[in-house]
Amino acid sequence: MLPPKIFFEKVKEIIWPIERKELKLFIPMALMMLCILFNFGALRSIKDSLVVPSMGAEIISFLKLWLVLPSCVIFTILYVKLSNKLNFEYIFYSIVGTFLLFFLLFAYIIYPNQDIYHPNDAMINNLIASYPNLKWFIKIGSKWSYALMYIFSELWSAVVINLMFWQFANHIFDTAKAKRFYPVLGMVGNIGLIIAGSVLVFFSSGQYIIDSELLTDSYNSSSNNSIMLQPIISIIVTAGIIAMFLFRIINKFILTNSINVLDVKKVAAKTKTKLALIESIKLIIHSKYIGRIALLIICYGLLINIVEGPWKAKIKELHPNTVDYVNFMGMFNIWMGISCVTFMIIGSNILRRLGWLISALLTPIMLSITGFMFFIFIIFIEEIGTCFGDFNLLYVAIIVGAIQNILSKSSKYSLFDSTKEMAYIPLSLELRTKGKAAVEVIGTKFGKSLGAFIQSLIFIIIPTATFDSIIIYLLVIFIVMMNLWIWNIIKLNKEYIKLCQ
């Protein structure tokens, strides 16, 4: 039996592997990630609560493919050009500031006056009746401001989290520190999801705020409809400003001493070698290693998109109005945050003790098990119902889907993100910076958009199709892509080991 002092040191090493001298850098980085993930959790629920109750869960496939993906491509081109001309710090302020400005404009100007900007329902219904195969595109046009909010909310994840924050972290930490810092950063940051869920539940369940349905219900006044949205957006903007303030503190006061692993002079010399846009794209395409990282992201995005569509359709059946939808998603965020923090504690030890390969494989394994269970439940829901009697099968289906979503995303945030970020570290600064820009933004959205393409193509060809009617085909695609993901991880691990040596 270990002496008490050694035992507690071992426990501390498992739960909190950060040394005291590193707290000066760790604390502001963790708080910055908490603010960014708070916004992610809140925006994720808001974007779904706007589009799903008003246009249907099937519309998500069209939004991801026809709007989100092109927006990501345009942003990547813009980012590569900016990275050749501006300091990373100014790029960060410009991008985050643009997001926050749009959210304010939407909540306080666009949304309250949506009746002025949106076409009337009679005209939309006539267009759908005349062009049934284009009904989903017509629905997007009818609520174009919701679609725009959806795009910006999606880009917050791809741009601010995956690209801006993690690129900054990769510049600061080497591989050894990343193994200790990244899981704990994620653990602290995911508390933001719990806070976001609590905020959403508070503003969607308080009867003193509003007594009836809000946001997307046209028979409510615009002022009442905005009562829930505006304070949430205000908190989101405040969190974004705090994140920028912390970013400034880190750059100005902390990265000037020995804690900064990055050699500033060396970086300045390297970044003088600029590539033209076409050359940058060629560099990314011809890098087999970057291609494998991109495939990781594509597989995850496609698989989670395939599962989320049917799940959100079931949520709409149970919660057809936006208040209940936001309230459910708020509770979902709380449990997601709790699960993520738990997985972060476990994941930090898996990564340090079992290595990169095992840590990277656990996410697809978790997603395959929980995803397969969800599909089987939906496909055989009637047969299952005969065994369990008078249970509310719709509610059970949603809970099964929620468990799948929570567990798979918890393993993704704790292990997938950390192992993916570690895979960038052995690369040169040029390839790491510009390769990551394309992989993170385009790769993230291409995976989801590929799943969206498959689904939207079916919905265009067969306007009467629903997620329930195509669920068996989605299961087949799910199994094929899961095997490809696992094979790619094994191949990437071999190249990662070579680069680290």
From Swiss-Prot:
Family: Belongs to the ADP/ATP translocase tlc family.
TM ranges: 23-43, 59-79, 90-110, 146-166, 183-203, 227-247, 293-313, 326-346, 361-381, 383-403, 446-466, 470-490
Gene name of this polypeptide: tlcC
One GO MF term attached to the UniProt entry: ATP binding
Location in the cell: Cell membrane
Entries under Pfam families matching the protein: TLC (PF03219)
Signal peptide start-end: none
One CC-aspect GO term: plasma membrane
UniProt keyword annotations, A-Z: ATP-binding, Cell membrane, Membrane, Nucleotide-binding, Transmembrane, Transmembrane helix, Transport
NCBIfam families reported in the protein's UniProt record: AAA (TIGR00769)
Entry-linked PANTHER family: ADP,ATP CARRIER PROTEIN 1, PTHR31187
Protein name according to UniProt: ADP,ATP carrier protein 3
Recorded superkingdom: Bacteria
Task performed by this protein: Provides the rickettsial cell with host ATP in exchange for rickettsial ADP. This is an obligate exchange system. This energy acquiring activity is an important component of rickettsial parasitism.
Membrane topology: Multi-pass membrane protein
